[in-house]
From Swiss-Prot:
Family affiliation: Belongs to the glycosyl hydrolase 9 (cellulase E) family.
Any GO MF annotation of the entry: cellulase activity
Reaction catalyzed: Endohydrolysis of (1->4)-beta-D-glucosidic linkages in cellulose, lichenin and cereal beta-D-glucans
Protein name, UniProt field: Endoglucanase 18
InterPro entries: 6-hairpin_glycosidase_sf (IPR008928), 6hp_glycosidase-like_sf (IPR012341), Glyco_hydro_9 (IPR001701), Glyco_hydro_9_Asp/Glu_AS (IPR033126), Glyco_hydro_9_His_AS (IPR018221)
Length: 478
């Protein structure tokens, strides 16, 4: 009866299967293209998103540093280094784990460029050994305006962490991002790879030596889970990048920091650490067994029919963790589910035990696939939550640049308050932000498609970054 229940529950998530096969290669292409619409700084000549133009060209000038470039993290015009670094780590993880699949659809070059746009900014933000700029722009004033990034005239206030004002979460994540990216570029640009790795080591030492929570000094994107997860995350990536035993010994010595959780996010990296180190456990590092146990607890908390299930799905089948920007948690969850199912397959392990219920690798992978398919249109509304994918998708994402006329079509400045006349129009955004994945439906699988509903309509870089690895995992089987 238990096995029948599991089959029935997993079958529920496939009930909205469309007759047409989903084009995962197209979804991957558009997921990557999204990042070109989020770029800050001087845009390159090969920029494909033509409704964007140069912006933020004096960022950092108030402190005589160059903080030009990087990504606007969501629908606003502020640059937050902590979530930008997490975004970059996820992008690099996808490039490393699914290189063949991404190459198969001719997207590896674009993905590397996307990663480099992020790492170049992180390198600039790391201005000295114990100094990292963590934010460019005043979030409060920016959020009170509705302006194109090309027009923005709100203060480009700078925030930073240092030995006297630490933020181990931000420094640790930046270290993880650069370490992961160093592997991406190792065989194609060894000089750049070495630069990334050296900065990663420096940032990790800074984060670990001057331990302190970013919660104490952050204006936005504050820490709620502490910094231990970022320190383990950085050390795990540095071990992957270097093979140096000191990093392995670090995670072994601090393995008790790891805890069983049910989400993976810009704030909480434990599930990512656990997945990475469980892979090392299966490679022979027996002292890492706790991480294997903990990542399996994460998987069991998500799987429908599990006796230890903690996260319940909507009636239509999507995991529902929080109402605000729920798809960020779904895409990161599928990142772990696909990665760990691949780890188990490589290790010759066919299943895991979740209390009284056993799940095969195929069941774990199929459930992850159902989440990707829901996002791409196999859901009760028969709509894709990725802008520009399929025939029905969000038309009013909560995004300043997308919702205002492009500077090419309307060169005249649109000031802080002037933009709200466009914000309040109940019409599709004039610029289609292809590839943007919005926050997603509510707990009843409903979506209003109103840009005023930022909790559900706002895209973010880390939603897309997590989705790239998940959709790439399906390309070989599509």
């Amino acid at each position: 009866m238990g096995k029948l229940l599991v089959v029935m529950l997993i079958g529920m998530f496939l009930a909205f299967e469309s007759l047409e096969a989903l084009d995962y290669g197209d979804a991957l292409n558009k997921s990557i293209l999204f990042f070109e619409g989020q770029r800050s700084g001087k845009l390159p000549t090969n920029q494909r998103v033509k409704w964007r133009a140069d912006s933020g060209l004096s960022d950092g000038a108030s402190a005589n540093v160059n903080l030009i470039g990087g990504y606007y993290d969501a629908g606003d015009n502020v640059k937050f280094v902590w979530p930008m670094s997490f975004t970059t780590t996820l992008l690099s993880w996808a490039a490393l784990e699914y290189q063949n699949e991404i190459t198969f659809v001719n997207q590896l070059g674009y993905l590397r460029s996307t990663i480099k746009w992020g790492t170049n900014f992180i390198l600039r933000a790391h201005t000295s050994t114990n100094m990292l700029y963590t934010q460019v722009g005043d979030g409060n004033s920016d959020h009170s305006c509705w302006e194109r990034p090309e027009d923005m005239d709100t203060p480009r206030t700078l925030y930073s962490i240092s030995s006297s004002s630490p933020g181990s979460e931000a420094a640790g994540e930046a270290a993880a991002a650069l370490a992961a990216a160093s592997l991406v570029f190792k065989l194609v640009d060894s000089t750049y790879s070495s630069k990334l790795l050296n900065n990663a080591k420096s940032l990790f030492e800074f984060a670990d030596k001057y331990r302190g929570s970013y919660q104490a000094s952050c204006p936005f994107y504050c820490s709620h889970s502490g910094y231990q997860d970022e320190l383990l995350w950085a050390a795990a990536w540095l071990y992957k990048a270097t093979g140096e035993k000191s990093y392995l010994n670090y995670v072994i010595s601090n393995k008790d920091w790891s805890k069983a959780i049910n989400e993976f996010s810009w704030d909480n990296k434990f599930a990512g650490v656990q997945a990475l180190l469980a892979s090392e456990f299966y490679n022979g590092a027996n002292d890492l067994e706790k991480f294997k146990t903990d990542v399996e607890s994460f998987v069991c908390a998500l799987m429908p029919g599990s006796s230890s299930q903690q996260i319940k799905p909507t009636p239509g089948g999507i995991l529902f963790i929080r109402d605000s920007s729920n798809l960020q948690y779904v895409t990161t969850a599928t990142t772990i589910l696909f990665y760990y199912s691949k780890t188990l397959t490589k290790a010759g392990v066919g299943s895991i035990q979740c209390g009284s219920t056993q799940f095969t690798v195929s069941q774990i992978r199929n459930f992850a696939k159902s989440q990707v398919d829901y996002i791409l249109g196999n859901n009760p509304l028969k709509m894709s939550y990725m802008v520009g994918f399929g025939t029905k998708y969000p038309t009013q994402p909560h995004h300043r640049g997308s919702s205002l006329p492009s500077i090419q079509s309307k060169p005249e400045k649109i000031d802080c308050n002037g933009g709200f006349s466009y914000y309040n129009f109940d019409t599709p955004n004039p610029n289609v932000h292809t590839g943007a994945i919005v926050g997603g439906p509510n707990s009843s699988d409903q979506y209003s498609d109103k840009r005023t509903d930022y909790s559900h309509a706002e895209p973010t870089t880390y939603i897309n970054a997590a989705f790239i690895g998940s959709v790439a995992a399906l390309i070989s089987s599509s």
